[in-house]
Amino acid sequence: MSLLCYNKGCGQHFDPNTNLPDSCRYHPGVPIFHDALKGWSCCRKRTVDFSEFLNIKGCTVGLHCAEKLPEVPPQPEGPATSSLQEQKPLNTIPKSAETLFRERPKSEMPPKLLPLLISQALGVALEQKELDQEPGAGLDNSLIWTGSSCQNPGCDAVYQGPESDATPCTYHPGAPRFHEGMKSWSCCGIQTLDFGAFLAQPGCRVGRHDWAKQLPASCRHDWHQTDSVVVLTVYGQIPLPAFNWVKASQTELHVHIVFDGNRVFQAQMKLWGVINVEQSSVSLMPSRVEISLVKADPGSWAQLEHPDSLAEKARAGVLLEMDEEESEDSDDDLSWTEEEDEEEEEAMGE
């Protein structure tokens, strides 16, 4: 007899006679909806898309349950206390610049590549995009710069002139696939655990080079935070995993994101606080990229970037306007309000 499992996140039918301790993968916590973000109290995954929220894989393994569980309404505010683990209260008072300076590591390790997590929806979009698409078709050679790299994944050719078009392009027409630590391309069956070996895999198709020029993109981007994680979100259509990378050290972040149409978003910043690089990651979705930075110490950040970083960008005339969505207004001396701007203008007028 087949029974329906009522564990949250499962919903599968099972045979009671073959119900084992690892048969069910479910969420023991409760759903959390906060400022358009949706997730479970028992794990860190957050999304703004409701269908992706429903498809978040369970974080706990156990027995299937045939008894209907009592309904628990979604929690409308910040992270809930899980029945398995008591969470620490959010420290809403940002640390001062002096405290941040004392706590920053004295010696910096070189930035490391953060792992890229490709959503199932993006994988489908990339596979649809590759159908009947010949790279490099219709490109005007007069628009190609000498020294431009071929944009096809797996090809490292460099444009030296019209004669470069005569050389074959060996590339991967498919999309990258990352599953349970294994990395491969959808167009060929070679799988590897090492990310460097994955990038070095030779292409499986021969075609034309794609010398398309990458255009700087003015992408909308914002950030939000919880007690333990800071999330920087960059919005754009169809990020291309093969060309994207994000590097981070404990106090610095370097971002290079390529979207469909060869539009590129780049950013470099010193972070307000210290992060745990090993636990941080990047999630790629059809309409955005989320960079999740795990804080080294729980607490609130007054802003995303360190004051020194903002001052340097202001002097260079490239100050990035970041919109912090979740945290409350800070009384920190580093905050600058419109009223203070008006007072300064009046003082200068006198």
UniProtKB/Swiss-Prot annotation:
May play a role during maturation and/or organization of muscles cells. Zn(2+) 3 binds at residues 150, 155, 169, 209. Expressed in skeletal and cardiac muscles but not in other tissues. Is localized in rows flanking the Z line containing alpha-actinin. SUPFAM superfamilies: HSP20-like chaperones (SSF49764). Zn(2+) 2 binds at residues 27, 42-43, 59. A motif (SH2-binding) lies at residues 159-162, 235-238. A motif (SH3-binding) lies at residues 28-31, 70-79, 173-176. The gene is Itgb1bp2. Zn(2+) 1 binds at residues 5, 10, 24, 64. Residues 216-305 form the CS domain. Interacts with beta-1 integrin subunit. This interaction is regulated by divalent cations, and it occurs only in absence of calcium. Zn(2+) 4 binds at residues 172, 187-188, 204. Residues 5-64, 150-209 form the CHORD domain. PANTHER family: CYSTEINE AND HISTIDINE-RICH DOMAIN-CONTAINING PROTEIN 1 (PTHR46983), INTEGRIN SUBUNIT BETA 1 BINDING PROTEIN 2 (PTHR46983:SF2). The keyword Thylakoid does not apply. GO terms for cellular component: Z disc. Keywords: Metal-binding, Repeat, SH3-binding, Zinc. Residues 72-92, 317-350 are annotated as: Disordered. Residues 321-350 have a biased composition (Acidic residues). GO terms for molecular function: calcium ion binding; integrin binding; SH3 domain binding; zinc ion binding. CDD domains: p23_melusin_like (cd06488). InterPro entries: CHORD_dom, CHRD1, CS_dom, HSP20-like_chaperone. Disulfide bonds: none annotated. This is Integrin beta-1-binding protein 2. It holds the Pfam family CS. It comes from Mus musculus (Mouse).
